Curated annotation (Swiss-Prot):
Originating species: Bacillus mycoides (strain KBAB4)
The name this protein goes by in its record: Protein-glutamine gamma-glutamyltransferase
Function noted in UniProt: Probably plays a role in the assembly of the spore coat proteins by catalyzing epsilon-(gamma-glutamyl)lysine cross-links.
InterPro entries in UniProt: Gln_gamma-glutamylTfrase_bac
E.C. designation(s): 2.3.2.13
Amino acid sequence: MIVIGRSIVHPYITNEYEPFAAEKQQILSIMAGNQEVYSFRTADELSFDLNLRVNIITSALELFQSGFQFRTFQQSFCNPQFWERTSLGGFQLLPNIAPSIAIQDIFKNGKLYGTECATAMIIIFYKALLSLYEEKTFNRLFANLLLYTWDYDRDLKLITKTSGDIVPGDLVYFKNPQVNPATIEWQGENAIYLGNFFFYGHGVGVKTKEEIIYSLNERRIPYAFISAYLTDFITRIDSRMMSQYAPPNTPQTSIGFIPIRDDAIVATVGHTTTIY
């Protein structure tokens, strides 16, 4: 269900020739048909969310095609022209290097980088926002950037839920409860949902849910009897918060609205929104 202000609406893409129109329409249809409530103050916020999700998907595919390597933190490596590898295996932005340039280098020279899956997901989020922000804004928000698992910049606002419906552009988690301790890095897999039943996970590539589970199951202890599974954890960029940094001239997606109800009372507790 999608709510704009106090109006429950069924939105649709009005310009079928705009970039990624089919993908955006699919996202809108999924959100409108879900039981979860997606609340936006304005149509522009919904437009930003759509464009953000599309950029998360394209950034995930770009990272997959970049040659970016899967490595544990003990074996991680980065381009020393832009980053310094920390003692824990993270990547610390070098002084006087613009975060925007350093993030773009990961996608241009992926073979010069290697790390595990959580860091890769955060890199995708940064790249998606960079596609929507002016570089000076991105560099101001994410100065002194550190890439290390979930130790992301405080200005990157994320929402993690343990319930809800998966929408393309969401980050999900596959858990492998009986992982072989010899390959503990496969205790789980963070993955971006690309839509059409496919996910991107750093280390497993672009696969269906069943294929990712199969890959994780191959790395269990001998005689394991508990399968890996897709958890109910969903992580998203807080598009309402992050949309405030988009420039005024940000291209807007052409969205039409079929009104369903315009007197909804919207109540939000934490990250859960309810309609009365």
